[in-house]
Regions:
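Short loop segments at secondary-structure junctions
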Residues: 40, 55-60, 166-169
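Phosphate/diphosphate-binding loops
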Residues: 18, 37-49
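Conserved PLP-binding catalytic core of the aspartate aminotransferase-like
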Residues: 126-130, 137-180
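PLP-dependent enzyme catalytic core of the Aspartate aminotransferase-like
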Residues: 168-169, 176-233
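Structural detector of well-ordered beta-strand residues that form the stable sheet scaffold
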Residues: 13-15, 36, 150, 185
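Catalytic PLP-binding core of fold-type I/II PLP enzymes
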Residues: 1-34
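Active-site C-terminal subdomain of aminotransferase-like
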Residues: 44-49, 54-124, 130
């Protein structure tokens, strides 16, 4: 994508929120112009934790469209100059002071990720998502369950989560799953998204998710939940 974009004189950036922390990245090697990502998914920062921004060094001299005092040249931030001088790196796109509590959580998580190694994390992630896909196929792929997989079967095209699809009652089934302590989400029109985290989830927990889904259908437990969607699903 980057190569084709540059061949047509197009700047290209990527949202890496669903890949950072579970997939290796080499943004410099790929010559990506910019990228951004949150830290509350696989980086385990929690709600409100800091966002991150990558800027290719060839764009360090660009003037940020939205400037803030924290993007000023770091060694002169407190000079209170009238003229804005952007830091000549990704820091030039910072706007204000980062939240310290959110940063603290991310710092601890990054230390664990570094110790584990992103290649090892990716290897376990592929095994976990493949295991989940195989279980859904074997246990839930027939009537009356009627679940299917929406994610790519080829792991090289798959990220860290698996989209489990069901034409009917996917939302209420996801709510029944949450009631059993499974953190999942629903995406219209028919997707239940499961995202095992290699750092702390286990294969046994994946097995439990699939058999929770089986029991939810066997016992019609989803009927205990409203069809009206919450604002956050």
């Amino acid at each position: 994508l980057t190569k084709k974009a540059h061949e047509n004189d197009i700047k290209i950036g990527f949202d890496c929120s669903h890949s950072v922390g579970v997939i290796p990245h080499n943004l410099d090697k790929w010559d990506v112009d910019f990228a951004m990502w949150c830290s509350y998914k696989y980086l385990n920062g929690g709600p409100g934790s800091s966002a991150f921004l990558y800027i290719n060094e060839k764009h360090f001299n660009k003037e940020p469209g939205l400037a803030g005092w924290f993007g000023y040249i770091k060694e002169k931030q407190f000079d209170l100059s009238i003229d804005f001088q952007s830091a000549q790196n990704a820091g030039g796109w910072q706007i204000s002071s980062p939240g310290i509590l959110g940063c603290a959580a991310v710092e601890g998580s990054l230390e664990i990720i570094k110790e584990a190694g992103i290649e090892n994390i990716r290897e376990k992630s592929v095994k976990m998502t493949s295991y989940l896909i195989n279980l859904v196929d074997e246990v839930l792929g027939r009537k009356p369950y009627n679940f299917s997989i929406g994610s790519p079967r080829d792991s090289s095209f798959r990220g860290g989560h698996v989209a489990i699809e069901r034409e009917e009652e996917a939302y209420r089934i996801s709510e029944a799953l949450k009631k059993k302590g499974v953190i999942c989400d629903f995406r219209p029109p028919n997707v239940i998204r499961i995202a095992p985290s290699p750092l702390f989830n286990t294969f046994y927990e994946i097995w439990k998710v699939v058999f929770h889904l089986k029991r939810i259908i066997d016992n019609s437990e989803y009927k205990n939940f409203s069809k009206d969607r919450d604002e956050v699903s």
